[in-house]
Amino acid sequence: MLKRKIEKSLLQWKNSPDHNPLIIKGCRQCGKTFITESFAKGNYKHTVYLNFFENPECKEIFAGSLDIDNLTMLITAFLGNKAQFKPHETVIILDEIQSCPEARTALKFFKLDGRYDVIATGSLLGIKGYNQNPASIPVGYETVMEMYPLDFEEFLWANGINEAIIDSLQSCLINEKPVPSALHHRMQELLLQYAVVGGMPAAVNAFIETKQLNLVLSIQRNIIASYEDDMVKYAENKDKPLIKACFQSIPKQLSKENKKFQYSLIKKGSTAARFAGSLQWVEDAGIIKRCYNPVSYTHLTL
């Protein structure tokens, strides 16, 4: 099991008094469902799980009254014995909540009722062209937490590098002291591996278990294909080719010396006026993260 930094944030959320229902948002396949189910198993006696993408029929539960007693009755009818509702002992997981805006509206009523914790996950929340209904967002009654693929420190944990070693490395960098040669070479090796493997949990697990980069590459290609499928399925028709062109230009953007995003690399003569909204769609979907005013840290001895 991969150790993730968000675990600490989840525990802080659970232990905070009078907490709101939680929404974990992030790109597809960054580990939201796995970490949510793992956290629920370790911190609650009972877990009630609904997935609106895999089981679209469960959206009907939220089509009528959002009274909590009514919802728990309908969920029990849908799940049978797998649904155990015990006040303050049950957590309800609403996976892929972007597929059911009414379920997001229901978060307000779960908050006001107060008997059950609710954790929702979503990967396409707020993107233009997909289930747009601002009235469904319960402003003030939900807490949003963003999840990302593994960062380099989490990648180090996955490779068995303990906290003491990481603390020693950070101390050297902060105090501008030389990193011991053996540690320096190991970190260089791991940084190169991270640059190739990336931070998607499936790719990281495959690399750690097999060390086969061809398997990692296959997983990466499948993830990219799923992102492109989302662009075709969920973006507005007029935006689909523009969004896909923006996304496919990213390798060229990153491979040039000047890291500033250049719209002309998407297509000759392209302008921000034509493509800025499409680039924003890709960011809103959690696929990219903009870096403003990047600074070079090549002088650090990592």
Predicted regions and their residues:
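Accessory nucleic acid-recognition modules appended to NTPase machines
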Residues: 209-300
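Hydrophobic anchor at the beta1->P-loop junction of P-loop NTPases
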Residues: 24
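Short regulatory helix/loop adjacent to the ATP-binding pocket of P-loop NTPases
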Residues: 127-142
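Hydrophobic positions on the alpha1 helix immediately C-terminal to the Walker A/P-loop
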Residues: 35
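Structural recognition of the conserved hydrophobic beta-strand(s) that form the central parallel beta-sheet
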Residues: 117-123
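Conserved lysine of the Walker
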Residues: 32
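Pre-Walker A adenine-sensing motif
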Residues: 3-15
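Short glycine-rich substrate-engagement loop in P-loop NTPases that contacts/grips substrate
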Residues: 57-84
